Design a protein with these regions (language model features):
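Surface-exposed loop/turn motifs in large extracellular/passenger domains
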Residues: 1-404
Length: 404
């Protein structure tokens, strides 16, 4: 790692260009195909770096005591409220693994970097970096990573955890990211300070809880133009985010009035046991200017929605426009063109439904199946709404204590 004071004096700036690694990396600390860790006071720019090829240059992350451990939290390295890396072993702390660099600081920039190798680490691992506190632009992961099982968490195609800025960086269409908790195509966990901006999102993401085509768990900002992903999870599964938290925002890119909406494209499929949506499995924050055209959103039971499976936040200016052989379906629960369930405090405003909704054994609504919140300025037209039991409604199947 470039962290020796004798080599890199405090405040120095370093640019490394066109570096390549073809060897396997094994370590118990910060693991990166190019650099393990960059000192916080060193300004580092990596340009056109690449790691490995399809069969070489694995980055294997281990477990060891953290030199920056937080004693108040049992020695676990705390990255963000709610994120602790001490889960695997109570006596040790997880470190970070990335195809290019284990952990980026605020002064680290990655430009046009590509990882062709694998990343083998169960916690806080990413195609380019385990944890990003800096800036990543035009990055790409070509290989696959992870395993769809408990214990694998905070895994992302670009960064396991993002506290910085990621722009136009995503896995290849053939890449797969697999894990248990907070698994995303770009970032597993996008913190409140994290910003992800994309023209196009691709890839395949498989998880258990909070699985998303861009971010598994989003507390920050995600803006995109086009999303074509295949996402599968057990609960809170979405084309963009598995769980969009109260502080999270999902919006179009660029964020200007004349821009087209963020579009979840026909090639997208979302499958979940509970809480599945074209944009978010569960929304507690803000989703606006999004259009769902996904080829398939299928939920075994509970909530299926064109935009969000369940909503307690705000969904503004969004549209479900998937019809014909494109499926929005729940086998035994509640299906809605915008949200399967609009909970207490949930707001659906200026939303449009022009697609199909099916609840095989439950309730189906053009906007939402169950409404406990508010629905204003909504429009339903040219739609096919089907249910085999209970209630069906053009706007909502059942208005519990909400306002329409």
């Amino acid at each position: 790692a470039l962290d020796e004071p004798a080599l890199n004096p405090s405040g120095s700036a370093i640019t490394l260009t066109s570096l390549s690694n073809q060897f396997n990396i094994y370590a118990n600390a910060y693991v990166g195909g190019i650099i393990g860790y960059n000192a916080a006071d060193t300004t580092l720019t990596l340009e056109n770096a690449s790691n490995g090829n399809q069969s070489q240059a694995q980055s294997y992350g281990g477990l060891a005591l953290s030199p920056r451990a937080d004693a108040a939290n049992g020695g676990a390295y705390i990255l963000d409220s709610g994120v602790s890396l001490g889960e695997l072993d109570p006596d040790h702390n997880g470190y970070f693994a990335g195809g290019i660099i284990g952990c980026t600081t605020a002064k680290t920039t990655l430009n046009h970097c590509t990882n062709y190798g694998g990343v083998q680490h169960p916690v806080a691992a990413g195609g380019l970096t385990g944890v990003n506190n800096g800036t990543i632009t035009d990055g790409r992961m070509v290989n696959s990573m992870g395993s769809q099982q408990e214990g694998y968490r905070y895994l992302g195609g670009i960064a396991g955890i993002n506290n910085g800025t990621i722009t136009n960086s995503a896995p290849a269409e053939s890449s797969s990211i697999r894990g248990g908790l907070d698994i995303g195509g770009v970032a597993g966990y996008n913190s409140k300070s994290g910003v992800i901006t994309l023209e196009n999102a691709n890839g395949n993401v498989y998880g258990i809880t909070a699985t998303g085509g861009v971010a598994g768990y989003n507390l920050g900002t995600v803006t995109a133009r086009s999303v074509t992903v295949k996402v599968s999870g057990t609960t809170q599964t979405g084309g963009v985010a598995g769980l969009n938290a109260a502080s999270g925002t999902i919006d179009q890119e660029p964020r200007t009035p004349s821009s087209i909406s963020i579009t979840v494209q026909n090639g997208t499929t979302v499958s979940s046991t509970t809480q599945g949506g074209g944009v978010a499995g569960r929304n507690e924050g803000l989703i606006q200017n999004a259009t769902n055209r996904a080829g398939s959103i299928q939920v075994v039971n509970q909530y299926a929605g064109g935009i969000a499976g369940s909503n307690s936040g705000r969904i503004y200016g969004c549209m479900h426009a998937a019809s014909g052989n494109r499926v929005l379906y729940t086998g035994g629960g509640f299906a809605g063109g915008i949200a399967g369930c609009n909970e207490v405090g949930g707001e659906l405003k200026i939303v449009t439904m022009n697609g199909s909704v099916t609840a095989a054994n439950g309730e189906a609504g053009g906007v939402t199946a169950h409404n406990y919140g508010s629905i204003t300025m909504s429009r339903v037209y040219g739609s096919d709404i089907r249910g085999t039991s209970d209630a069906i409604g053009g706007i909502t199947a059942c208005n519990e204590a909400g306002a329409v």
